[in-house]
């Protein structure tokens, strides 16, 4: 009896021995953690943020589910880069300077739900870069430099629900671009340069409910393309240069509830423009050029019509609109621009009989005169009604391609020596880039009164003659980048009063063409990067009161004079990076109450004085000071900057010390990496402040030797012998109080008094 009993126990004992032998190895694998990371094994989270890592760490615990690598220097994601962490569900690779994702980079991550590749430098995605992500629900590619999408790129993402491609450089959507995305509900394509959508671009998206296409260059409503997404409930098309929408545009979306067409260039709307959108509930037309609107036929469930910011004329012709609004119970929020007796009146507060239909010729003449004083308005563009009328299509110039459906014409790279003529009269986008026109003559674009976007890049243009843009009253985008222009006259730009975006990068400008800008009252965005401008003087920005964005990166600017930016009181973005500024132009920032983003990186600043950003303290949200040779930051340098500041970039400087910045309480990002911090008692206030931040900032000790490589935030042992260490839980010392001696840089002093004396100079 004993023999059989012992033999049955042998198979049970061996597996137990194997498990006992493997247990230490498993425990070690679970407890390992890369030196540059923080591992929370209880929650299976690993964070390696802002550590200047150039490759994915290979000692990450195998059972990790959330891996945060944001803010490193990975540049390339190689094949099978994450094969050692197959349990990942969330992977964050934002701000990693990624330029290439190799084929098969994410193979083995079959459980991944979120992949964040936003804010990198990707120009393309290889065909199989996203293979192996069969469970992925959300893919973030916002803020890259993607120029094209290849069909099949997303074919392996059958579970994806949200795809974010906003803020890239897409100009064209090919057919079947999103093939395989059977469960995508939200597709974000906003803030690109999309002007053409292939007929089958949105095919194969049966679950799509929300499509974001705002802030692109669509100049005609691509109805047939959009209508492929039959399940759309919300469509965002705002801030596109659309001038007209009608039934002939072919928009048919039976489930559409919200349609946003705000901030465009709409001058007319056909009564049946949305006749095939029967469930439309909200229509947003704010900020267009509509002076009148017909009763809309078809969308019987419409309840909200947003019309703010349109020059509505509440004369007799608006009575049908008011009657329809009352009958259909549609709420509207527009206001009358005229006639004078109704100016400013809310449309919703008027009754049809408030709009007079004059019975005598004198009264009618008075109204016509008043409307003329209010300003000429282009006649509304409607559908063609027969041959020989305004929209009759002219022959296309030889060697060019004219597409009637999109109203686009292109002669790109045709070797032309002069601007051709004979384009269709309803052309809205004209692409003449990569030809050779030494000059653009007077009236070079006759009969193109509907033109919205004109591309003249890489044409060797050295001169725009007076009147070159004559007749282009609807032009909004003018691309003159990569030419030989050294100057621009006001006479050259006359005829394009609605021009909003002017691109002059990589020309030969020695100064900002201020006189020319005076001819552009609607200028919104000025691009003058990579020229040879050496200073900004008063008058350089003309009378550009509508100006919001100014890009002057990569010039030779050494001085920004007091008042140089004054006319642009609504300025939101100012890019002065990669210039020769030796000081922050504090005085020149006076009078910019709306400034949100200031780029000063790549200037030889060396030091920041007290109150350097005081004039824009209340509005500024993003401040870039990286790669500026900074060696000293005075205690009050950031005074005035408060809770509004969201990001502060100080990486790649020469900072050995930095005051604490407790007033910056709402920071979402602060980058202090690649600075040689000296971790002695002088740095104690910074250490204390950083320990209270739930952010990875990248600050590491360079000296003394016993602290080298330690994170300033975590190097408690370095500061234990400092005076006041025992009182670390007491109320913190304000940043402006000098808590330690500082060695000032020769010729540089902290103090607002000196700033005040020289604040207008650089």
From Swiss-Prot:
Extent of the signal sequence: 1-30
UniProt feature, compositional bias: Basic residues: 728-745
Boundaries of every LRRCT domain copy: 310-359, 675-724
Comp. bias regions, Pro residues: 377-386
Disulfide bond annotation, renumbered to this chain: 396-411, 679-722, 681-701
Per-repeat ranges for LRR: 87-108, 111-132, 135-156, 159-180, 183-204, 207-228, 231-252, 255-276, 279-300, 426-447, 450-471, 474-495, 498-519, 522-543, 546-566, 570-591, 594-615, 619-640, 644-665
Main location (coarse class): secreted
Keyword Protein transport attached: no
UniProt record, GO biological process: negative regulation of chondrocyte differentiation; negative regulation of collagen fibril organization
Residues covered by the LRRNT domain: 31-62, 387-425
Keywords: Disulfide bond, Extracellular matrix, Glycoprotein, Leucine-rich repeat, Repeat, Secreted, Signal
Glycosylation-annotated residues: 52, 626
A molecular-function term among this protein's GO annotations: collagen fibril binding
UniProt subcellular location: Secreted; Secreted, Extracellular space, Extracellular matrix
A single cellular component GO annotation: extracellular space
SMART domains hit by this protein: LRR_BAC, LRR_TYP, LRRCT, LRRNT
Description of how the protein assembles with itself and partners: Associates with collagen and binds to collagen fibrils.
Family membership: Belongs to the small leucine-rich proteoglycan (SLRP) family. SLRP class IV subfamily.
Protein function: Potential negative modulator of chondrocyte differentiation. Inhibits collagen fibrillogenesis in vitro. May influence chondrocyte's differentiation by acting on its cellular collagenous microenvironment.
Protein name, per record: Chondroadherin-like protein
Gene designation: CHADL
């Amino acid at each position: 009896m004993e023999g059989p009993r012992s033999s049955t126990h042998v198979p049970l004992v061996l597996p137990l021995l194997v498990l006992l032998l493997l247990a230490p190895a498993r425990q070690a694998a679970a407890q390992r953690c890369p030196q540059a990371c923080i591992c929370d094994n209880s929650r299976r989270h690993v964070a390696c943020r802002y550590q200047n890592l150039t490759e994915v760490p290979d000692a990450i615990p195998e059972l990790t589910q959330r891996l945060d690598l944001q803010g490193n220097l990975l540049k390339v994601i190689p094949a099978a880069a994450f094969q050692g962490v197959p349990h990942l569900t969330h992977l964050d690779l934002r701000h990693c300077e990624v330029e290439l994702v190799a084929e098969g980079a994410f193979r083995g991550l079959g459980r991944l739900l979120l992949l964040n590749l936003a804010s990198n430098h990707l120009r393309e995605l290889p065909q199989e870069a996203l293979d192996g992500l069969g469970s992925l629900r959300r893919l973030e590619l916002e803020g890259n430099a993607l120029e094209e999408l290849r069909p099949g790129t997303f074919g392996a993402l059958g579970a994806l629900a949200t795809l974010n491609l906003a803020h890239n450089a897409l100009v064209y959507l090919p057919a079947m671009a999103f093939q395989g995305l059977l469960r995508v509900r939200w597709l974000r394509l906003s803030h690109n340069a999309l002007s053409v959508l292939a007929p089958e671009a949105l095919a194969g998206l049966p679950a799509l409910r929300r499509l974001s296409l705002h802030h692109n260059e669509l100049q005609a409503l691509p109805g047939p393309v959009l209508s492929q997404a039959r399940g759309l409930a919300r469509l965002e098309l705002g801030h596109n240069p659309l001038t007209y929408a009608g039934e002939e545009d072919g928009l048919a979306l039976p489930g559409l509830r919200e349609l946003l067409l705000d901030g465009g260039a709409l001058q007319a709307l056909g009564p049946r423009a949305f006749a095939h959108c029967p469930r439309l509930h909200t229509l947003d037309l704010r900020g267009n050029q509509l002076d009148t609107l017909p009763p809309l036929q078809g969308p019987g469930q419409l309840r909200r019509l947003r019309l703010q910011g349109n020059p509505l004329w509440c004369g007799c012709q608006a009575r049908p609109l008011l009657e329809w609004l009352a009958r259909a119970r549609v709420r509207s929020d527009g206001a009358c621009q005229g006639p004078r007796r109704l100016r400013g009146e809310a449309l919703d507060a008027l009754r049809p009989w408030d709009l007079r239909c004059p019975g005598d010729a004198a009264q009618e003449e008075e109204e016509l005169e008043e409307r003329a004083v209010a300003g000429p308005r282009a006649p509304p563009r409607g559908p063609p009604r027969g041959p020989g009328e305004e929209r009759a299509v002219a022959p296309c110039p030889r060697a060019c391609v004219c597409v009637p459906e999109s109203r686009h014409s292109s002669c790109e790279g045709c070797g032309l020596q002069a601007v051709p003529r004979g384009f269709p009269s309803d052309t809205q986008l004209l692409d003449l880039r990569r030809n050779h026109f030494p000059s653009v003559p007077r009236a070079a674009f006759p009969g193109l009164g509907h033109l919205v976007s004109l591309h003249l890049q890489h044409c060797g243009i050295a001169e725009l003659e007076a009147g070159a843009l004559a007749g282009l009253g609807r032009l909004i985008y003018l691309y003159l980048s990569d030419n030989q222009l050294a100057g621009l006259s006001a006479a050259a730009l006359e005829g394009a009063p609605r021009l909003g975006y002017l691109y002059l990068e990589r020309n030969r400008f020695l100064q900002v063409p201020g006189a020319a800008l005076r001819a552009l009252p609607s200028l919104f965005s000025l691009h003058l990067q990579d020229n040879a401008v050496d200073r900004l003087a008063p008058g350089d920005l003309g009378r550009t009161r509508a100006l919001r964005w100014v890009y002057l990166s990569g010039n030779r600017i050494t001085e920004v004079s007091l008042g140089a930016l004054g006319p642009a009181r609504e300025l939101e973005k100012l890019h002065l990076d990669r210039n020769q500024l030796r000081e922050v132009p504090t005085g020149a920032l006076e009078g910019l109450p709306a400034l949100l983003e200031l780029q000063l990186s790549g200037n030889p600043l060396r030091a920041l004085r007290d109150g350097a950003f005081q004039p824009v303290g209340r509005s500024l949200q993003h401040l870039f000071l990286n790669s500026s040779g900074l060696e000293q930051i005075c205690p009050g340098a950031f005074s005035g900057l408060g809770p509004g500041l969201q990001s502060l970039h100080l990486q790649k400087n020469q900072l050995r010390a930095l005051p604490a910045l407790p007033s910056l309480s709402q920071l979402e990002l602060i980058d202090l990496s690649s600075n040689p911090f000296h971790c002695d008692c002088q740095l104690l206030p910074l250490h204390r402040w950083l320990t209270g931040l739930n952010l990875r900032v990248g600050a590491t000790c360079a000296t003394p030797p016993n602290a080298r490589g330690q994170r300033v935030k975590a190097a408690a042992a370095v500061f234990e012998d400092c005076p006041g260490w025992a009182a670390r839980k007491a109320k913190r010392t304000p940043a402006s109080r000098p808590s330690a001696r500082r060695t000032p840089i020769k010729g540089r002093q902290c103090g607002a008094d000196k700033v005040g004396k020289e604040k207008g100079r650089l």
